[in-house]
């Protein structure tokens, strides 16, 4: 009998805005941010094993097998659910590492949701999101799969419905260290909190942008080039830069001009992640 298999998408996210309100006693930063998904991402294939072994068959340069967030997510879920089954995992990786579009966090969330389904654990979203938070602050939004206004370190989520434009996303060929940006002495850390709900339109500033563009000329260049066509923004701590367009045709036209010299892609913004749409279709 062939082992049960499942292939799931692992979508990218954008931070449509990112405000840093202050530094907490535990060293983390208090944030307010707006998450939206892209219909673009990695693809992860899972095959159940009956011997309890967890094996990721795709190698990542410079990332030991057991340190990979996918493997850590699988092991934590296996331990906390006391599941005796194992899993073989393959990933078709297109999202950049250190790009600010949530590649690792999204992979971890897809793993938690995929294994919950294949191992028939019956965990609810709250329980999976709580486990996800122990792996990273951005994992819960991918577990929940809905565009959200996030507070705290990014884990307190309120569902929102921003517009869903087409985006041009540019991928400067640098990996930005989040820790480096958050420890920069020039980082703005005192933005007043947004208290109005829903969050007013037009709050699109990313407090990390001045520091990132100062440290990384490649990011600055991408912002300047995309900024000739639309408001160019930084997602997360970068390196990826994005801008919205009303139609795919317009986004494609700008992308064609810019990707002669830069790496990038076009994707539709989505308030319900393509991972959750796929999981719904399995029910």
Swiss-Prot record:
Keyword Transit peptide: no
GO molecular function, one term: ATP binding
Positions of the catalytic residues: 13, 138
Pathway terms, separated by semicolons: Isoprenoid biosynthesis; isopentenyl diphosphate biosynthesis via DXP pathway; isopentenyl diphosphate from 1-deoxy-D-xylulose 5-phosphate: step 3/6
Protein EC: 2.7.1.148
UniProt xrefs under Gene3D superfamilies: 3.30.230.10, GHMP kinase, C-terminal domain
One Pfam family, short name: GHMP_kinases_C
This protein's record includes keyword Disulfide bond: no
Record's catalysed reaction(s): 4-CDP-2-C-methyl-D-erythritol + ATP = 4-CDP-2-C-methyl-D-erythritol 2-phosphate + ADP + H(+)
Broad enzyme group: transferase
Binding positions (ATP): 96-106
Alphabetized UniProt keyword annotations: ATP-binding, Isoprene biosynthesis, Kinase, Nucleotide-binding, Transferase
GO terms under biological process: isopentenyl diphosphate biosynthetic process, methylerythritol 4-phosphate pathway; terpenoid biosynthetic process
Functional note: Catalyzes the phosphorylation of the position 2 hydroxy group of 4-diphosphocytidyl-2C-methyl-D-erythritol.
Family: Belongs to the GHMP kinase family. IspE subfamily.
HAMAP family named among the record's database cross-references: IspE (MF_00061)
Name of this chain's protein: 4-diphosphocytidyl-2-C-methyl-D-erythritol kinase
Organism encoding this protein: Pseudomonas fluorescens (strain Pf0-1)
């Amino acid at each position: 009998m062939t082992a049960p298999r499942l292939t799931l998408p692992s979508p990218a996210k954008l931070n449509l805005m990112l405000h840093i309100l202050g530094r907490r006693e535990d060293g983390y930063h208090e944030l307010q941010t707006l998450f939206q998904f892209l219909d673009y991402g990695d693809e992860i294939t899972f095959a159940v094993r009956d011997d309890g072994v967890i094996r990721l068959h795709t190698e990542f340069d410079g990332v030991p097998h057991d340190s990979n967030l996918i493997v850590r997510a699988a092991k934590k879920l296996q331990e906390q659910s006391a599941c005796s089954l194992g899993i073989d995992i393959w990933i078709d990786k297109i999202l950049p590492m250190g790009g600010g579009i949530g590649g690792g966090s999204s992979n971890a969330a897809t793993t938690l949701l995929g294994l919950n389904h294949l191992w028939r654990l019956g965990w609810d979203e709250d329980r999976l999101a709580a486990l996800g938070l122990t792996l990273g602050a951005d994992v819960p939004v991918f577990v929940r799969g809905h565009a959200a206004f996030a507070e705290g370190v990014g884990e307190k989520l309120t569902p929102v419905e921003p517009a869903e434009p087409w985006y041009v996303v540019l991928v400067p060929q640098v990996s930005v260290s989040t820790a480096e940006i958050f420890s920069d002495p020039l980082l703005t850390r005192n933005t007043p909190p947004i208290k109005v709900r829903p969050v007013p339109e037009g709050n699109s500033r990313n407090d990390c942008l001045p520091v990132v563009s100062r440290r990384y000329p490649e990011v600055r260049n991408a912002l300047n080039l995309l900024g000739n066509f639309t408001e160019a923004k930084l997602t997360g701590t970068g390196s990826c830069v994005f801008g919205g367009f009303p139609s795919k045709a317009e986004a494609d036209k700008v992308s064609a001009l810019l990707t002669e010299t830069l790496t990038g892609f076009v994707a539709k913004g989505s308030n319900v992640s393509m991972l959750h749409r796929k999981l719904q279709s399995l029910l």
